[in-house]
Regions:
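Helix-coil modules at protein/domain termini and other flexible surface or pore-lining loops
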Residues: 1-167
Length: 167
């Protein structure tokens, strides 16, 4: 359920000029011009002038920050039933990213792990040729898990994914 009272419409530039604090497009893993061309209109460039719908959130340090609604909610397309909310196709569907915990601390830890996982997945998805394959261990829990999946007919490879978190 999306609380429409937390939504704001505008470009990052116009929202910043209005005194709000939108996330910068450069802070996200985005499609390159080449990828946008390759997908033949499925996605659009996301920059400071892109008109979109934003949702209010908070940074880890408690600062209010606006982020594109399409990067937060899986069901963002349903917003058209409730009003005019521009949502350009600036990103692939966000099927993950929800985090919770029994305490504030555990929720924050889970959220940080989710951010790292999503960032690594997007780096891998958008740059598969740049990710070197790593050797699969011969013994131990990872080897057992790999064997379990191979026994079910799956092909397994492990890749190294460079990311801004150095993990």
């Amino acid at each position: 359920i999306i609380d429409t009272r937390t939504l704001v419409t505008g470009s990052g530039k116009s929202l910043h000029e209005a005194g709000l604090n939108p996330a910068r497009p450069a802070d996200f893993v985005l499609f390159s011009q080449e990828q946008i061309a390759r997908f033949e209109g499925r996605f659009e460039l996301f920059d400071e002038n892109t008109l979109t719908t934003w949702v209010k959130g908070r940074t880890f340090h408690g600062e209010e920050r606006l982020v594109p609604v399409s990067m937060v909610f899986v069901n963002h397309r349903r917003l058209s039933k409730f009003g005019r909310y521009p949502i350009p196709p600036i990103n692939a569907p966000a099927y993950a990213g929800i985090s919770a915990g029994q305490t504030y601390t555990s929720a924050c830890i889970n959220a940080l792990q989710e951010i790292m996982e999503r960032h690594a997945t997007m780096c891998w998805w958008h740059n598969p040729a740049n990710n070197p394959r790593l050797s699969i261990p011969k013994r131990g829990p990872v080897a057992s898990l790999v064997q379990e999946f191979k026994a079910k007919g799956n092909q397994i490879c492990i890749v190294g994914i460079e990311n801004r978190f150095n993990m």
